[in-house]
């Protein structure tokens, strides 16, 4: 499995999609035979997984957008990305 760093540019794997689940009234990552519920923070990060933006760029954008500490945001973004990658939902 690839090592995730601030320079990684993740994207959703083939067959995984970001979708609003009306039954749950929640955003989810929908993968074959499984659903991963996303909280509000995970959603704004997952919406930026396009394969072109690095995690550092995503974190900086979010830090600016939410007027938050960039290093804290970057740590959280890397942690979330690592979790989703371990669940085989992302490609790097």
From Swiss-Prot:
Keywords: PQQ biosynthesis. Monomer. Interacts with PqqE. It comes from the Bacteria. GO terms for molecular function: quinone binding. GO terms for biological process: pyrroloquinoline quinone biosynthetic process. Pathway: Cofactor biosynthesis; pyrroloquinoline quinone biosynthesis. Functions as a PqqA binding protein and presents PqqA to PqqE, in the pyrroloquinoline quinone (PQQ) biosynthetic pathway. It holds the Pfam family PqqD. The keyword tRNA processing does not apply. HAMAP family: PQQ_syn_PqqD. This is PqqA binding protein. The keyword Cell membrane does not apply. Belongs to the PqqD family. It comes from Xanthomonas campestris pv. campestris (strain B100). NCBIfam families: PQQ_PqqD.
């Amino acid at each position: 499995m690839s090592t995730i760093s601030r320079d990684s540019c993740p994207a959703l794997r083939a067959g995984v999609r970001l979708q609003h689940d009306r039954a749950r009234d929640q955003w989810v990552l929908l993968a074959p035979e499984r659903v991963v519920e996303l909280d509000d923070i995970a959603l704004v990060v997952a919406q930026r997984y396009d394969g072109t933006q690095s995690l550092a760029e995503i974190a900086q954008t979010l830090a600016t957008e939410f007027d938050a500490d960039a290093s804290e945001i970057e740590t959280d973004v890397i942690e979330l990305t690592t979790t989703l990658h371990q669940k085989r939902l992302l490609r790097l």
